[in-house]
C-alpha cells in the first residue's frame, strides 16, 4: 500500500476523498471498496474497531459515519498521527465521537475492546488473522470485515477469506459478502 501525500488536506471529508483517490490511482479501481462496505453495513453500528490503521483511510470512513466510539489499533500509529489525527480530533469533538487509539499488536490483550463492527487490515497472513479473530471475535456484536481477501502482495491469494469464513462457520457467524474485485474484502455477520 502506498503512503498517500495528505499534507494539504484540511478536513476529514477531504482526507477521505484524497486518500481514496490516491490509493485507487496507485492500486487500481475498486481498491477502496472496503470503504463502501463499512458504509453499507453501518446501520445500527455505534462502536467501531479497526486493527491495522496505517494512514487511516478506513478510519476516516468510520468518522464520517459518525460512529460514537472508534477504536484504532496498530503496532505503529505514526502515519495516522501525521495527517488524520489532528483532523479526527477536532471532528470528533464537533460530532460527539470518542476516539481510542492503541499502539499495540492486535493479537495482544492490550488491544481488546468491544465493538459492533471490527475491521481487520493488519498483517496479511492467516496464522496472524486467526489469533486476532480468536481474541476479538467474542467482543464483536454485529460484523467483522477483512480487507485483502482475494489478492495479497499483487498475487491471487484467498487465505484471509478462507480463514475468516472458516472461523466464522466454527463460531456461529454467517458469510454475508465476499467481494473479489481488486484485493477484495469479506464480511461476516454474527449469526
Q: Predicted segment positions?
A:
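S-adenosylmethionine/decaboxylated-SAM
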Residues: 20-23, 27, 31-191
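Class I SAM-dependent transferase core
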Residues: 5-29
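Short, Lys/Arg-enriched, disordered terminal segments
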Residues: 1-3, 191
